[in-house]
Amino acid sequence: MKKDTLLEKIKDLSDLDKHQEIIDMIEGLPTEQLNNEIIGQLARAYINVQNYEKAIEVLKSIEKDEKNTMLWNYRMGCSYFYLKDYEKAEEYFLKAYNLEPEDENIKDFLMDIYINLSKQVKFGEDDLDNQKKALNYALKAKDYMTTDDKKIECYSYLAFLYNKFTDYHTAEDLLKRAISLGRDDLWIHSELGYCLGELNKLEESLEHYLRAIEIAPSNTWLLSQIAWTYRCLGRYEEALKENFKALDLGEKSEWVYVEIGYCYKELNNYDKALKYYLEANKISKDKNVWLLSELVWLYNGIKKYENALEYLKKLEKLGRDDSWFNSEYGFCLIGLKKYNEAIEKYKHALEKENNLKEIIRYNSQIGFCYRLLEKYEEAIENLKKVLEKINGNKKNDKQMRRFF
């Protein structure tokens, strides 16, 4: 078969995706009919049937003559790319790029190679070296963007990285660029909503979360994020509505119960706040210090001091021993009429407090306990300390007197 006829036959079979027939035909040819172009077509056919190792073997048989051609390097790069050996693929595609820098297919492969190399880098929160390595690969990908679709892909991935590295301003810019180029899906609006939330641009964050929920109305993570955003904006009724949607869809998580409880607390509905906080605590099994502290505060607030004491003891087991904890403990003990114990807790709180307003409040409570114990001399001495604190802080004298 003449060379031109053979190449035409190969082209026709390739157009019909009959790549195995191409392989069988070329491998059945006598040696004298083979040349580098035909062997290159054999390698191409092996790539198309996903036998990349064989493609590399075939290409290496003509390496001496073809290693400085774009097509040979392109095919070697393709083979290594699909074998996920991205470093080798990079080597060959860079050679191909240097030979034909305007070829868009080469640029597309290089962009994909650098994104994949970036994804292969494993890093932790404090692993700055590997974070930088992952980012540098992704920034290289940016040099080879071609179409709007490739720009969207690259900007989106870079934004994902910058969000992970908490560089939310850069992530915001990249996500908005991707949207301006036409990306309008669940991921992009969820990612931008999260990013804007971290930047405290809550109204704008909400817009993107609401667009995302239009696309995926049953996405419980989105519903909880929308609820959280409403809650941060002080729109507690709307937050509750979204949290209950998530709950109805089966998202019976500690997070959702806590958010519902928090909203009810802010709406001064302490009974309902307690109900949902207690549901959350069943899940956390008395391990969430913040949640136990909220329960203490609520029980103290509705004068259920025995219940408050129960959760104070749980907090104590977890090691909480700051000024807030001791002051709440003291308040609870006053409610239980255990004034001497309350005094000790407030004294302990004072040892850990630097805020003048709180120091004055704790001393006032100690004085109050002494008065209830009919230890009037001690009460007077303690209240003198309060006055000394007030008068000793001339800058805030007026404010502190008003507080006292």
Question: Can you name each region flagged by the protein language model?
Answer:
Residues 19, 26, 52, 59, ...:
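Hydrophobic/aromatic packing residues within the alpha-helices of TPR/SEL1-like helical repeat arrays
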Residues 33-34, 66-67, 101, 146-149, ...:
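Short coil turns that delineate tetratricopeptide repeat
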Residues 28-29, 61-62, 96, 141, ...:
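Canonical positions in the second alpha-helix
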